[in-house]
């Protein structure tokens, strides 16, 4: 492309007038952002427009020595590009241009059509805001607050009762004094999208212009005018989404012309705090303060902190002198590039190196256990349910079937018994079983209206339902395709009702229906519908969650005889109300939870059940309490024996031959390998049920696709995003991991929803700005519990039906805590986690205060400065003389 000296001259003129001239070449962003959009005639006219100086068309025409008609035509085109603006003075348009940033470049990025045509515009905006502010960074870190051209404003709710708050601390002042307000795209997010580096926060309807700016950009068609009431709604929606309010303070506070709603993962102004580590440059007059005693480490403030100034840590004292939950920050350390954080968009962490509450860290879904326990203790049950559902849409289901890794890791368990976390959750989730009391979340997204991109979910098991739930909450139209006649997958067809009543599953699925999720049953994608057919029907992304719903045969001679079932096959029949013929003498093969479920279900069908397991009792993967329940109901166990052959007469199973085993050397998983002894025994049976594993049946979904399969038939995906080799196809749950627990599938479904949201909006990265949810538990052995305040209350137990009663019914006879029991159990929680604040990194936005339900974090006013006009700011940070700016430029270049 030919170099254009006239455009270089124009860029130089703007920079000189802005006092930011550092020498401009054809490779610099100031040139590259103007070159594609300004032709020679436009350039000739713009040379006679001046920085922040009002000139009518007649004045510009006179200076350019062109006709008024020609000049007006070029000015109109320049305004359309966003490079030139106008304001009305005495009813007449007066033309000017602002500084580069915030100013010209944001204006250029407001024009979507030209941006999509010339992606270099976004690249230039990014480059300028990265390279040019760097020369000011050393001065901006001098301890002065809010000295940069953009400045954070605290959320109104955080300071509304603060007697020290001034009018220039309140964004309300700007809204109320505005003569016009418009809303339009976020230029930073648009630039990121053009570069393929979007963070998942979308650009539309987020940033507001005020007064003359609002009139100019709405008349150009890039913004839309809004009322003050609508402006407050936009601000509230931004806060709900965790976005920070910032203002352009270059005209001075009273004449502020823009309010941005920013995220730390895309905003070029917040980058000052994160990349250069100079948060004071943009900080409001406030800073956050954490009340550690009130904090319950729910993590809501951490996840929404745009500068990663908050992390989860420990509340209790530690016996290890090497553990410290504090930040080592020193403002006196000289500023240097070595202190930059160039990977800030991908390296944020949620947890201090010493770890945090194990209940949250070890849960696959990272549910804020400590938080909902505290809410329950206060009787705030709906809020507790809401908090749980931020990570798990099925608390009533999981309160009955979860494998309770939170309890296994509970710090209290290192003292006596762990907190009965699942029973507390089960008590809270009783509200979900009734339509009048269940919690149905409101749609939450940036645009305040549903998205139009249709999403298909294949499989109505826990992974598919979780993905559908979180996509629906975000406002997407979701259709779930299920080959069975009922939803729930293994929750409905693979777990017997005495462990999970179907009305519980259906009640929580009803929430999805209220959210607008559509279900289509009897549709087997891969057989009567293909992936291409879904695409042709307008689905922009597909989530595969068909699970591992096929049983594994016994794998020995005779496993094809009548009366031989797989565990999955048997449980499916039972859950559909059928009565498979099993007779009175049933052998169940396996040692996992499915084998226990099968054995207990067979007992309820009147059978005498013997469970055969090739290892010892200690090696059984089944939950200990379920093994005990099975024993109490009459299931007999034969350990260290493996099936060799199923014998039969007239095509029907009548006996099973087993070999006595011994345990040899550990296998690749560390489990001692069973080795045959050569001793055999034959047991009479009327049926054999093999519950030794589950298999994946894709039903031909992968035919003709780029899907890659693993050794066990699992679908291979990116481990962080769940994206397959078909870019619009994502997968999760047992289909990816092989058989695991419901909570694992639920967690995977939520992560896939994050990925799908990013995928259906072109230009969004799957990894940039993503919370990688890398949690670490504190070491319970180092927690110091004060004996004088230790609550010795024993663990509470719900009243369950007796084993004799239980084995006669398929109803779940396990009890639910009384409210008194629940309150006693919540008091046993040690509350070992708390948030840790890095005050030096805090920007005083107050978003954290809007997320905390425990009054554990607030804003405190620590400064009393307000916005100052651009040139005063520039001179102040540079040393109060134009010559100092030159010295600063030379110093910056030399570093």
What are these regions (language model features)?
Residues 307-358, 373, 416-421, 425-454, ...:
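Flanking helices and flexible, charged tails adjoining ferredoxin-like Fe-S electron-transfer domains
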Residues 92-131, 879:
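Short, amphipathic alpha-helical interaction segments positioned at domain boundaries
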Residues 560-585, 666-739:
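FAD-site-proximal beta/loop scaffold in flavoenzymes
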Residues 367-377, 418-422, 457-525, 552-555, ...:
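Beta1-alpha1 glycine-rich phosphate/pyrophosphate-binding loop at the start
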Residues 428-449, 507-527, 551-605, 709-725:
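Glycine-rich dinucleotide-binding loop and its adjacent helix/turn
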Residues 36, 66, 95, 246-259, ...:
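Ferredoxin-like iron-sulfur electron-transfer modules
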């Amino acid at each position: 492309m030919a170099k254009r000296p006239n455009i270089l001259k124009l860029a130089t003129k703007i920079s000189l007038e802005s006092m930011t001239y550092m020498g401009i070449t054809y490779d610099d962003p100031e040139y590259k952002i103007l070159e594609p959009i300004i032709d020679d005639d436009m350039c000739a006219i713009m040379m006679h427009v001046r920085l922040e100086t009002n000139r009518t068309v007649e004045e510009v025409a006179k200076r350019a020595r062109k006709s008024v008609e020609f000049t007006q035509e070029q000015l109109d085109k320049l305004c359309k590009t966003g490079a030139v603006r106008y304001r009305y003075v005495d009813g007449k348009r007066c033309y000017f241009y602002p500084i580069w940033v915030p100013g010209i470049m944001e204006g250029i990025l407001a024009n979507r059509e030209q941006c999509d045509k010339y992606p270099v515009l976004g690249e230039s905006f990014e480059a300028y805001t990265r390279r040019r502010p760097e020369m000011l960074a050393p001065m901006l870190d001098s301890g002065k607050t809010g000295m940069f051209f953009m400045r954070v404003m605290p959320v109104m709710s955080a300071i509304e009762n603060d007697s020290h708050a001034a009018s220039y601390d309140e964004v309300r002042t700007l809204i109320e004094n505005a003569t016009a307000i418009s809303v339009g795209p976020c230029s930073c997010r648009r630039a990121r999208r053009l570069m393929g580096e979007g963070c998942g926060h979308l650009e539309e309807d987020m940033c507001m212009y005020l007064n003359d700016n609002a009139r100019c950009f709405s008349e150009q068609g890039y913004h839309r005018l809004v009322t003050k009431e609508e402006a407050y709604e936009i601000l509230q929606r931004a806060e709900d989404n965790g976005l920070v309010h910032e203002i352009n303070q270059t005209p001075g506070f009273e004449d502020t012309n823009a309010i941005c709603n920013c995220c730390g993962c895309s905003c070029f102004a917040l980058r000052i705090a994160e990349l250069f580590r100079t948060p004071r440059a943009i900080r409001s007059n406030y800073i956050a303060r954490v009340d550690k005693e009130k904090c319950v480490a729910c993590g809501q403030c951490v996840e929404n902190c745009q500068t990663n100034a908050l992390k989860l840590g420990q509340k209790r004292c530690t016996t290890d002198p090497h553990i410290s939950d504090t930040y080592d920050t020193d403002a006196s350390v000289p500023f240097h590039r070595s202190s930059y954080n160039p990977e800030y968009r991908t390296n944020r962490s949620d947890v201090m190196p010493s770890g945090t509450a194990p209940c949250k860290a070890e849960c696959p879904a990272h549910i804020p256990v400590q938080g909902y326990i505290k809410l329950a203790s206060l009787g705030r049950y709906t809020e507790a349910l809401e908090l749980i559902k931020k990570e798990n849409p099925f608390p009533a289901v999981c309160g009955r079937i979860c494998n309770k890794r939170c309890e296994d890791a509970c710090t209290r368990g290192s003292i006596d018994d762990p907190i009965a976390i699942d029973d507390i959750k089960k008590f809270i989730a009783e509200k979900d079983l009734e339509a009048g009391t269940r919690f149905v979340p409101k749609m939450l997204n940036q645009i305040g209206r549903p998205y139009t991109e249709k999403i298909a979910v294949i499989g109505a098991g826990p992974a598919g339902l979780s993905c559908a739930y979180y996509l629906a909450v975000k406002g997407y139209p979701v259709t779930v395709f299920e080959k069975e006649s009922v939803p729930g997958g293994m929750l409905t067809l693979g777990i017997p009702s005495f462990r999970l009543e179907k009305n519980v599953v259906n009640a929580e699925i009803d929430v999805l229906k209220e959210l607008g999720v559509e279900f289509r049953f009897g549709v087997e994608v891969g057989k009567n519908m293909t992936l291409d057919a879904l695409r042709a029907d307008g689905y922009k992304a597909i989530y595969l969650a068909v699970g591992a719903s096929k049983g594994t045969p016994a794998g020995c001679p005779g496993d094809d005889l009548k009366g031989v079932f797989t565990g999955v096959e048997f449980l499916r029949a039972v859950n559909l109300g059928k009565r498979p013929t099993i007779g009175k003498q049933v052998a169940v093969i396996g040692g996992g939870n499915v084998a226990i479920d099968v054995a207990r279900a067979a007992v309820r069908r009147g059978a005498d059940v013997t469970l055969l397991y090739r290892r010892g009792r200690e090696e059984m993967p089944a939950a200990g309490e379920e093994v005990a329940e099975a024993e109490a109901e009459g299931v007999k166990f034969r350990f260290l024996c493996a099936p060799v052959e199923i014998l039969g007469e007239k095509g029907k199973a009548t006996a099973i031959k087993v070999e006595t085993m011994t345990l040899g050397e550990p296998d690749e998983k560390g489990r001692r390998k069973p080795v045959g002894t050569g001793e055999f025994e034959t047991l009479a049976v009327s049926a054999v049920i093999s519950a030794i594993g589950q298999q994946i049946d894709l039903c031909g979904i992968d035919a003709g696709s780029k899907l890659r399969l693993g050794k066990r038939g699992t679908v291979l995906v990116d481990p962080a995003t769940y994206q397959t080799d078909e870019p619009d196809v994502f997968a999760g749950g047992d289909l990816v991991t092989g058989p695991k627990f419901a909570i694992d599938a639920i967690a995977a479904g939520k992560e896939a929803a994050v990925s799908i949201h990013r995928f259906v909006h072109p230009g969004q990265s799957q990894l940039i700005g993503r919370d990688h949810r890398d949690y670490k538990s504190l070491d319970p052995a180092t927690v110091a519990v004060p004996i004088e305040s230790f609550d010795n209350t024993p663990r509470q137990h719900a009243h369950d039906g007796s084993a004799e009663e239980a084995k006669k019914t398929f109803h779940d006879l396990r009890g639910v805590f009384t409210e008194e029991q629940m309150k006693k159990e919540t008091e046993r929680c040690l509350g070992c986690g708390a948030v840790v604040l890095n005050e030096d990194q805090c920007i005083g936005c107050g978003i954290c205060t809007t997320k905390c339900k425990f009054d554990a974090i607030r804003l405190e006013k620590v400064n009393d400065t307000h916005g100052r006009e651009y040139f005063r700011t520039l001179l102040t940070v540079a040393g109060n003389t134009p010559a100092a700016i030159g010295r600063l430029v030379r110093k910056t270049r030399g570093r």
